[in-house]
UniProtKB/Swiss-Prot annotation:
PTM comment, free text: The reversible ADP-ribosylation of Arg-104 inactivates the nitrogenase reductase and regulates nitrogenase activity.
SUPFAM superfamilies in the cross-refs: P-loop containing nucleoside triphosphate hydrolases (SSF52540)
Pfam families in the cross-refs: Fer4_NifH
InterPro entries: NifH/chlL_CS, NifH/frxC, Nitrogenase_Fe_NifH, P-loop_NTPase
Catalytic activity: N2 + 8 reduced [2Fe-2S]-[ferredoxin] + 16 ATP + 16 H2O = H2 + 8 oxidized [2Fe-2S]-[ferredoxin] + 2 NH4(+) + 16 ADP + 16 phosphate + 6 H(+)
The protein's required cofactors: [4Fe-4S] cluster
UniProt name for this protein: Nitrogenase iron protein 1
Signal sequence segment: none
Protein family (similarity comment): Belongs to the NifH/BchL/ChlL family.
Residues modified as ADP-ribosylarginine: R104
HAMAP family: NifH
Organism: Nostoc sp. (strain PCC 7120 / SAG 25.82 / UTEX 2576)
Binding site for ATP: G13, K14, G15, G16, I17, G18, K19, S20
Length: 295
């Protein structure tokens, strides 16, 4: 069973946006502040806990279950490891590429953890979820009411914003039935022009906040190469302070909202306003016409 006092959060975002890196650095800072945390990796790459564990990839629930024959044959200590500052780490895993549903690993892992008492003596459970909300399996932490606070990692790049809007749409779908809410956008900077202003504008349109702007800093990559969080690798760095600031904001966050996703033309108008997308009027002679008609 799950303690009702636990705050269950999830980090979503476009693939490659730096979601796992951002979440682990932020959760490490939260652990430094005395929060008791468990990370449940919901990505078949199983990279949601590697900075916490100083490892390439943790053995996943699905992988071990396949070896043993059934998830019921596993022991909790085999799949839940302890990392930096006592953070508990689990990776759900997924099937071989092209075979089966990766969302099944999330469902199997969470059920196993609940049935074996993993959710006891915790302040936060964090789900690190693959990419966009592309299927019901990956939306499972939202759909089943597991994750109550969603943080979307995005940037001022066009596809990251498209993904953020789609994720907001997924949250809205389950907000009334499951009680899930959007906690805010985390801008993981790509040094796009007017990036902070753009993401604040996007957040306002989505009825949420830009909870923090994480500047780009090479020290993040230096720490990653050593399989460490910034907080452990360079605790006195400016970037470490940024993650601590974000951690504090999440701990104290009470602005949990039902998002208002944008229609595609509204989102594209925002992108045009900030110069990320060409104005279609410049190409009106070909827009909307069959390809053969524009040769």
């Amino acid at each position: 069973m799950t303690d009702e006092n636990i705050r269950q959060i999830a980090f979503y975002g476009k693939g490659g946006i730096g979601k796992s890196t951002t979440s682990q650095n932020t959760l490490a800072a939260m652990a430094e502040m005395g929060q008791r945390i468990m990370i449940v990796g919901c990505d078949p790459k199983a990279d949601s806990t590697r900075l916490m564990l100083h490892s390439k990839a943790q053995t996943t629930v699905l992988h071990l279950a396949a070896e043993r024959g059934a998830v019921e044959d596993l022991e909790l200590h085999e799949v839940m490891l302890t990392g930096f500052r006592g953070v508990k780490c689990v990776e759900s895993g997924g099937p071989e590429p092209g075979v089966g549903c990766a969302g099944r690993g999330i469902i199997t892992a969470i059920n196993f953890l609940e049935e074996n008492g993993a959710y006891q003596d915790l302040d936060f459970v964090s789900y690190d979820v693959l990419g966009d909300v592309v299927c019901g399996g990956f939306a499972m932490p939202i759909r089943e009411g597991k994750a109550q606070e969603i943080y979307i990692v995005t940037s001022g790049e066009m596809m990251a914003m498209y993904a953020a809007n789609n994720i907001a749409r997924g949250i809205l779908k389950y907000a009334h039935s499951g009680g899930v809410r959007l906690g805010g956008l985390i801008c993981n900077s790509r040094k796009v022009d007017r990036e902070d202003e753009l993401i604040m504008n996007l957040a306002e349109r989505l009825n949420t906040q830009m909870i923090h702007f994480v500047p780009r800093d090479n020290i993040v990559q230096h720490a990653e190469l050593r399989r460490m969080t910034v907080n452990e690798y360079a605790p006195d760095s400016n970037q470490g302070q940024e993650y601590r600031a974000l951690a504090k904001k999440i701990i104290n966050n009470d602005k949990l909202t039902i998002p208002t996703p944008m229609e595609m033309d509204e989102l594209e108008a925002l992108l045009i306003e900030y110069g990320l997308l060409d104005d279609d009027t410049k190409h009106s002679e070909i827009i909307g016409k069959p390809a053969e008609a524009t040769k």
